[in-house]
Amino acid sequence: MIIKGIGGFYYVEAANQVYECKARGIFRKTGITPYVGDRVAISVEENDTCAIEEILPRKNYLIRPPVSNIDQLILVVSVCDPAPNPLIIDKTIAVAEDKGIEPIIVVSKTDLQGYGELEEIYTKAGIPFYAVSSATGAGVKQIQDLLPGKITAFTGNSGVGKSSLLNRIDPRLSLETGEISQKLGRGRHTTRQVELLKLEGGGYAADTPGFSSIDLERGERIKKENLPFCFREFEPYLGVCKFPSCSHTCEKGCAVLEAVKAENIHPSRHESYCAMYEEVKDIKEWQMK
């Protein structure tokens, strides 16, 4: 499995060793780029040079950041400094749902401020929700228990405490952490490349660049017809609207809108859905390529 890629070299873990490999030219010719997380077949020559010969089928992948075969995505959200942005949270969850990746929300810095509203929104949506404080260690054991045997991508905006959380999960990692800029109110980008980190308790963590620039019109695109299925709390109401072509944004007889009125779906989540629908509704099939 590729655990890191940098400068045209790919570092492949196999049989408890790490091999520095180059990708065969055939991959460039066919437009295939090896991703961190790819399971690959490699060859080892007599002079110890190694090459990636084959990339095995991926169960999923992200384009930005380039990482594949993810089991779960832990989205770290801070209660303050920086404040949570529901639309960015919901876009990230939707991308995970569309790719078949289990989304998990971890709220950080809970020693500084309450998080009741966030908890209400996402527990109502059926999204696994955890609260931690990297400063005190509260809640970290629960996150550690989620990781063995899985590839977990850790993501979130700059400054939310991803690296601090990973350092708490496995102190051997000693990841650089970024202090919040007092002037900008944002953290320095301390994660410069995607790398799979082998965890002491089992499993791998992908510490990925922040998702602050995620855009459904570029990179991780979701088809208009798939978007409702990326909001798992919509599922009981899909297919029962008055009109088969219902967009679930404003139509009369929409079961999703009725569920929002009945407080079975949180208004914040529906607002995010409507904003995302506006972004994708006019994208043509050929633009998805």
Language model regions located:
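Short, glycine-rich nucleotide/cofactor-binding loops
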Residues: 77-86
